[in-house]
């Protein structure tokens, strides 16, 4: 039986992190978690990490698409926080962001890791950005590192 799986060390990986500025009090912690994970676990060099800032979660897919189209990166991490309010706006923003990022991964055959929090409350967002529920930015980075390596393994074996 042949099993293809990736590890998380990826010293030469070039990673773009597309970050929403909206809800920055949460998103900055996600960014710190992602960068720390890339460096400590993935051994990714500072020079191989590019941060792209956009206004909000709706803008993440367009910026991520431009990054993917450049052909200069092995993967993209999208970070943001969409917190439910009193209107259906939350559903539209969260859904379109998720759909757009998934399309980019398939269109460009490139790992795009979804580190966009979609929570009902500010407290839930804070918990997922480095307190009780861990740091979802760091988790998104781990997933990205593994997928970069899985795709490289598949390329070599297929």
Curated annotation (Swiss-Prot):
List, alphabetically, the PANTHER family matched.
6,7-DIMETHYL-8-RIBITYLLUMAZINE SYNTHASE, 6,7-DIMETHYL-8-RIBITYLLUMAZINE SYNTHASE DMRL SYNTHASE LUMAZINE SYNTHASE
> Which reaction equation describes what this protein catalyses?
(2S)-2-hydroxy-3-oxobutyl phosphate + 5-amino-6-(D-ribitylamino)uracil = 6,7-dimethyl-8-(1-D-ribityl)lumazine + phosphate + 2 H2O + H(+)
Q: Which residues form the active site?
A: 89
Instruction: Please give the family membership noted in the entry.
Output: Belongs to the DMRL synthase family.
Which InterPro entries does the protein's record reference?
A: LS, LS/RS, LS/RS_sf
| GO BP | riboflavin biosynthetic process
According to its UniProt record, the EC number is: 2.5.1.78
Provide a GO CC annotation, any one: riboflavin synthase complex
Q: Identify the coding gene.
A: ribH
Which species expresses this protein natively? Answer: Shewanella loihica (strain ATCC BAA-1088 / PV-4)
Positions annotated to bind (2S)-2-hydroxy-3-oxobutyl phosphate: 86-87, 128
- Residues of the signal sequence? none
Q: How does it assemble?
A: Forms an icosahedral capsid composed of 60 subunits, arranged as a dodecamer of pentamers.
One Pfam entry for this protein is DMRL_synthase
Task: Fetch the HAMAP family from UniProt.
Answer: Lumazine_synth (MF_00178)
Q: Which UniProt keywords apply?
A: Riboflavin biosynthesis, Transferase
Which Gene3D superfamilies is this protein grouped with? Lumazine/riboflavin synthase
Quick one: which pathway?
Cofactor biosynthesis; riboflavin biosynthesis; riboflavin from 2-hydroxy-3-oxobutyl phosphate and 5-amino-6-(D-ribitylamino)uracil: step 1/2
Its function? Catalyzes the formation of 6,7-dimethyl-8-ribityllumazine by condensation of 5-amino-6-(D-ribitylamino)uracil with 3,4-dihydroxy-2-butanone 4-phosphate. This is the penultimate step in the biosynthesis of riboflavin.
**Keyword Transferase belongs to the record:** yes
Q: One MF term from GO for this chain?
A: 6,7-dimethyl-8-ribityllumazine synthase activity
Q: Where does 5-amino-6-(D-ribitylamino)uracil bind?
A: 22, 57-59, 81-83, 114
Report what the protein is called.
6,7-dimethyl-8-ribityllumazine synthase
């Amino acid at each position: 039986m042949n099993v293809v799986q990736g590890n998380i060390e990826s010293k030469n990986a070039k990673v773009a992190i597309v970050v929403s500025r909206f809800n920055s009090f949460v998103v900055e912690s996600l960014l710190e978690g992602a960068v720390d994970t890339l460096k400590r676990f993935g051994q990714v060099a500072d020079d191989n990490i590019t941060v792209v800032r956009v206004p909000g979660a709706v803008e993440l897919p367009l910026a991520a698409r431009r990054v993917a189209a450049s052909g200069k990166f092995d993967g993209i991490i999208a970070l943001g926080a969409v917190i439910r309010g009193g209107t259906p706006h939350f559903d539209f923003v969260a859904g379109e962001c998720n759909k757009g990022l998934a399309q980019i991964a398939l269109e460009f055959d490139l790992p795009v890791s979804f580190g966009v929090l979609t929570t009902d409350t500010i407290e839930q967002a804070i918990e997922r950005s480095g307190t009780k529920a861990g740091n979802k930015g760091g988790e998104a980075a781990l997933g990205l590192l593994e997928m970069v390596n899985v795709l490289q393994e598949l390329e070599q074996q297929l």
